[in-house]
Amino acid sequence: KKQEIERYVAARNNTVLNFPDRGPWGNNKYRGNCSGWIIAYLIWRYGVKSLAELFAGGGTGSDVCRDMDIPYIGADLNPNPVRNNILTTDAVSDEVPDEFRDKDMLFMHPPYGAEIGIPYAGSMYKDPTGKLAKSDLGQMPWKDFMKTLNAIIMKYYAAMAPGSKMAVLMGDVRRKGVYHSMFNDIVMPGTVLQTYVKMQNNCVSDGRTYSNRFTPIGHEMMYVIEKPMNAYLINYKIPFEKEMDIRNSQAAT
């Protein structure tokens, strides 16, 4: 089975990744679940020997690693994880699980903020007190969401072993005429090894009719970074917004 999976992803080795189906892994009813072929591709392409996954959701990563015969540990906000190798973890407030620290690669496919309209706490799993919703990235306004996600990425990057890799799959969102780009707003620690475009298939929005001036979003982005062997220095790039009144600028004409 492992060899069949490797042959399938190897035949599609490209910076534009296009897998028409999500594969037989995980729960396809779990909103926001990514294609298992993406995780399988990363394992093949980067020779991953053990994988950690944050925002493990519907169990896709666990199932892929089972079929590719490598150790796996996941973490998710869900108090009742769907697999026994997924830990209940609040990525916002909890420390990085010790089980994550020695893995070859950390994979993340985070929620995309409140703008996309996919909440998890209280929707995909019960949240009777409302406490989990406060740490649910899927319920945070965009700026709060990106600030929180960037802090999580840096926290988990700091805990990674030198020489290990992190892959983050992310998407763009348009809501009420405003375009939000995760790739534009996300922090990039370490050394960037590769960026990928991942084509979207079988989306809920595919059946909708749009005006001619509207461009449907048909892709996601992913970066793969590596933590340098020098464990005492953390280098990163983070976007920031700045506003200037041109009336106060000496360069204005």
Roles of regions detected by a PLM:
Residues 1-253:
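Class I S-adenosyl-L-methionine-dependent methyltransferase catalytic core
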